[in-house]
Amino acid sequence: MPTWSRTESFLRDWQSLSPEDRRKFKKAVKNFVADLKTGTFRKGLRVKGIQGAEGIFEMTWAKDGRATFEYGPEVRPKNPDIVWRRCGSHSVLKKP
């Protein structure tokens, strides 16, 4: 099971999400975690690196819902550590 943390930016973004958007994000994270175990992300999550932001990735959780993350140092051996950086609309990609 992966470990995870959230940046202050993520926490601010989270507070601005509607309850429906929070539900959608949580559903996408369940799929994301399942895919981490297999090593291949499903196409619907559209996980990819962000150009110009080395080591930072984006995930799509709704039509205009994006989250950014990076891998942190492993807390538990052989379990990835995910640092959630931002979540919100496509605009979060401007400052991932």
Over which residues does each language-model region extend?
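A short beta-strand-loop micro-motif that forms or neighbors metal/cofactor-
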Residues: 26-31, 77-81
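Noncatalytic linker/hinge segments flanking ATPase motor cores
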Residues: 2, 23-24, 43-48, 68-71
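Arg/Lys-rich, positively charged N-terminal/basic patches that mediate binding to nucleic acids
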Residues: 1-30
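Generic secondary-structure microfeatures
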Residues: 18, 29, 33-36, 54, ...
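Enriched for short, Lys/Arg-rich terminal
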Residues: 1-3, 12-15, 57-96
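A short, surface-exposed loop/turn module that caps and links secondary-structure elements
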Residues: 33-59
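Residues that form or immediately flank small-molecule/cofactor binding pockets and catalytic motifs
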Residues: 9, 52, 89
